[in-house]
């Protein structure tokens, strides 16, 4: 039965459900999720630009979604949410309810009948390519054009071409794209840089923010705000025109991240904003939903079960907020620095996010100056100065490095991570503290094959011994900004060595590396190691230009 907007009414999603293969999942948890994900079905938040958020697969398919993900019809939970329905969701649900209790019913056969499974493009490069030639060959293979999308698909169409990371990541990702752009620009593909900037501006205008990725199930959160740095990158080629062209979306993105700041009392939080007891305003990662992530449904249900003393919705929100951080998952977000079930992302003020917000404020001030809106220039210059003061007060560890702050516990966290170099990357750190941070980073994180993500081995992918291309670039640039060219070169050459060793052995680039010098791909995480790989390609090209010894 449909309501006037053509959406299935939530009351029809509440009959008895058979949970295939749920012996390891408490029925109470599954029922709670079903109520949370389905009874909110018709609620589409107004994004302020005349468009409602399209529904994600968990809301479109309700009990069928729960059954498919719980039964693990596909090994990867992301597969089902990326499928394309062959009929209207209401028709599919009606068929499911009619057939599910019939003897001999096969859920897998039903899904095969009604959904088209996404396929991963097999990339077979020519033999004997150099590393540089291989990356340049990959750009067209990783480029997608989806100006339209099938009805009720989770894919959000974008007006212009874009580059995907590769593997299971069949869509564009927000913060990945900055590092991909570094390589595209080095390859002379400024056309793609401009296209992706325009796509992000389109999403800001449509949704009010840049989603995690162009999928409906990513719309409830963003990712680290690199849009300002993308504009800065474009400005290196086209000059000041880039600032005026993207000034309006930059200001809209800032408004998104600062929602609720004016009306939040000291000691309270609202969305991505936290107001500390002294009135200082800083940002945190957040997600507007508090249910299991559709693309990782079963894992999130299991994690909440491992924290029986916490409301499941609280755990799920913190898992989602960690996904917004891009560091999913890491000891940075764990209460005990070791266990996923202790995750408390929304209680933490991250040093990287607040450095990026400083950059956003600076870029808006610069754009306003170019546009000769000097009142705006003063306003955002003041925002940036206040944030710099706040970062120095709250996000500095007495041991001599920048760190995250737990605003609920009222103390800086001890975890030293590669995120410590972000204030240096955006050039907001005083020289003395910058030098201290670089010394600590070099001593604790620099390995034979590059910079380790953290000092802790937790089996999570954003911890030791993994190293990630974007964090190498951030630390390298941070070192250069503060006069440490030799350290920058050491980081760059060591990580490039990791990439070269694996490429020599397997003829591919991957999303993360073990930086112990073995030349192997990184481990941990919720899925197998992916190759492609957008941001590794981008950073590697820049490293080849700087330290590639003629390659």
Swiss-Prot record:
Its EC number is 3.2.1.28. The gene is treA. It is found in: Periplasm. It is an enzyme of class 3 (hydrolase). One of its GO terms (cellular component) is periplasmic space. Gene3D superfamilies: 1.50.10.10. Residues 1-45 form the signal peptide. Substrate binds at residues 168, 175-176, 212, 221-223, 293-295, 326, 526. This is Periplasmic trehalase. One of its GO terms (biological process) is trehalose catabolic process. HAMAP family: Peripl_trehalase (MF_01060). PROSITE patterns: TREHALASE_1, TREHALASE_2. Its main location: periplasm. It catalyses: alpha,alpha-trehalose + H2O = alpha-D-glucose + beta-D-glucose. Provides the cells with the ability to utilize trehalose at high osmolarity by splitting it into glucose molecules that can subsequently be taken up by the phosphotransferase-mediated uptake system. The keyword Signal applies. It comes from Ralstonia nicotianae (strain ATCC BAA-1114 / GMI1000) (Ralstonia solanacearum). The active site is at 328 (proton donor/acceptor), 511 (proton donor/acceptor).
């Amino acid at each position: 039965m449909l309501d006037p907007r053509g959406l299935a009414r939530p009351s029809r999603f509440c009959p008895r459900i058979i949970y295939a293969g749920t012996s390891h999942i408490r029925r109470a948890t599954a029922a709670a999720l079903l109520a949370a994900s389905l009874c909110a079905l018709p609620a589409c938040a107004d994004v302020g630009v005349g468009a409602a958020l399209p529904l994600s697969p968990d809301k479109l398919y309700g009990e069928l979604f729960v059954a498919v993900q719980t039964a693990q019809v596909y090994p990867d939970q992301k597969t089902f949410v990326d499928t394309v329905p062959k009929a209207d969701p209401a028709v599919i649900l009606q068929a499911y309810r009619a057939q599910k209790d019939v003897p001999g019913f096969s859920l897998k056969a039903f899904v095969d009948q009604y959904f088209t499974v996404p396929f991963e493009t097999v990339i077979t490069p020519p033999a004997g390519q150099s590393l540089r030639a291989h990356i340049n060959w990959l750009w067209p293979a990783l480029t997608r054009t989806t100006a339209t999308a099938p009805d009720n698909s989770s894919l959000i169409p974008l007006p212009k071409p874009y580059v995907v990371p590769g593997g299971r990541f069949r869509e564009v990702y927000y913060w990945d794209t900055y590092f991909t752009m570094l390589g595209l620009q080095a390859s002379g593909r400024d056309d793609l840089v401009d296209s992706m900037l325009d796509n992000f501006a389109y999403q800001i205008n449509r949704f009010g923010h840049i989603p995690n990725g162009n999928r409906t199930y990513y719309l409830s959160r963003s990712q680290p705000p690199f849009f300002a740095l993308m504009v800065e990158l474009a400005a290196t080629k086209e000059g000041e025109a880039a600032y005026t062209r993207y000034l309006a979306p930059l200001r809209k993105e800032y408004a998104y991240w600062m929602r609720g700041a004016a009306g939040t009392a000291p000691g309270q939080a609202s969305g991505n904003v936290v107001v500390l007891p002294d009135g200082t305003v800083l940002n945190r990662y957040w997600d507007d939903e508090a249910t299991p992530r559709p693309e990782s449904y079963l894992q999130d249900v299991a994690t909440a079960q491992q924290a029986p003393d916490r409301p499941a919705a609280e755990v799920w929100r913190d898992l989602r907020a960690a996904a917004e951080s891009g560091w999913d998952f890491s000891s940075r977000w764990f209460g005990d620095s070791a266990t996923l079930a202790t995750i408390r992302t929304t209680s933490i003020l991250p040093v990287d996010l607040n450095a990026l917000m400083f950059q956003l404020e600076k870029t808006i001030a610069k754009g306003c100056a170019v546009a000769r809106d000097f009142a705006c220039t003063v306003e955002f210059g003041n925002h940036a100065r206040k944030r710099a003061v706040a970062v120095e007060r709250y996000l500095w560890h007495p041991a001599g490095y920048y760190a995250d702050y737990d605003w609920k516990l009222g103390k800086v966290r001890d975890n030293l991570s590669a995120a410590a170099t972000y204030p240096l990357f955006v050039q907001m750190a005083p020289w003395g503290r910058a030098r201290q941070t670089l010394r600590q980073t070099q001593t604790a994180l620099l390995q034979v094959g590059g910079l380790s993500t953290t000092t802790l081995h937790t089996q999570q992918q954003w911890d030791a011994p993994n190293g990630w291309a974007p964090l190498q670039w951030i630390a390298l640039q941070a070192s250069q900004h503060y006069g440490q060219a030799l350290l920058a070169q050491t980081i760059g050459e060591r990580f490039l060595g990791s990439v070269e060793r694996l490429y020599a052995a397997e003829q591919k680039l991957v999303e993360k590396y073990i930086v112990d010098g073995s030349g192997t791909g990184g481990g941990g995480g919720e899925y197998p190691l992916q190759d492609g790989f957008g941001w590794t390609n981008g950073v590697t090209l820049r490293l080849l230009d700087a330290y590639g010894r003629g390659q």
